[in-house]
Amino acid sequence: MERVKMINVQPMLEAAEFLERRERECEHGYASSFPSMPSPRLQHSKPPRRLSRAQKHSSGSSNTSTANRSTHNELEKNRRAHLRLCLERLKVLIPLGPDCTRHTTLGLLNKAKAHIKKLEEAERKSQHQLENLEREQRFLKRRLEQLQGPQEMERIRMDSIGSTISSDRSDSEREEIEVDVESTEFSHGEVDNISTTSISDIDDHSSLQSIGSDEGYSSASVKLSFTS
């Protein structure tokens, strides 16, 4: 029973403490139980302030919208100029017929699409042909290497044989030249004997000098060579 009484009294105590705390706050000025009524001056001054804010907001929004509109117009103008330039370049790149004097944008784009498809098809054919040519080139190169293998070995063998023969021939010719040089070497006494003998023979046979024979010319040349 006492416990039930304590449960019933507890909310009442909490409510009393709450009311007491609110009274103290009102006394110190932290809060008021009733809101204060606004003065007539404030009531009349608030609506004009709200109107001025609305006017400022409306004027600011109008300026912003005007700036946005001008920016949009400028961007649209630039976009149309760029599109016109691209269409002019497209007319130059696409082969157009002589009877086509005026083109619409849609017709020009369709012709460009068809022309691009033709170019892609031609590129595929060219690539396929190039691959076939490269394959044929590799086959011919391997075939040429196979054919040149025995011929190259034969040529190298013949070159080696020819070089050996030429070296032997040059050695024999060098020996013959040395033998000829050794056979033509004379002493000073032999040269003097030959010169005196040839001079006496020429004096004894002076009549032969008048004849324009080969022996006369040879003897004269021998005389000139020894006298010099």
From Swiss-Prot:
Gene3D superfamilies: Helix-loop-helix DNA-binding domain (4.10.280.10)
Subcellular compartments: Nucleus
InterPro entries: bHLH_dom, HLH_DNA-bd_sf
UniProt key word Transferase: no
Ranges of biased composition (kind: Basic residues): 43-56
CDD domains, A to Z: bHLHzip_MXI1
Residue stretches of biased makeup (Polar residues): 57-70, 216-228
Renumbered residue ranges of the record's region Disordered: 29-76, 162-228
GO molecular function: DNA-binding transcription factor activity, RNA polymerase II-specific; protein dimerization activity; RNA polymerase II cis-regulatory region sequence-specific DNA binding
Domain (bHLH): residue spans on this chain: 67-119
Primary subcellular site in the record, as a coarse category: nucleus
Coiled-coil segments on the chain, per record: none
Record flagged with keyword Transcription: yes
Bias (Acidic residues): 173-183
GO CC annotations on file: nucleus; RNA polymerase II transcription regulator complex
Short name of any one Pfam family annotated for the protein: HLH
UniProt keyword terms in alphabetical order: DNA-binding, Nucleus, Repressor, Transcription, Transcription regulation
A single GO BP: negative regulation of transcription by RNA polymerase II
Function: Transcriptional repressor. MXI1 binds with MAX to form a sequence-specific DNA-binding protein complex which recognizes the core sequence 5'-CAC[GA]TG-3'. MXI1 thus antagonizes MYC transcriptional activity by competing for MAX.
Subunit structure: Efficient DNA binding requires dimerization with another bHLH protein. Binds DNA as a heterodimer with MAX. Interacts with SMC3. Interacts with RNF17.
Descriptive protein name: Max-interacting protein 1
Species, as recorded: Rattus norvegicus (Rat)
Lineage: Eukaryota, Metazoa, Chordata, Craniata, Vertebrata
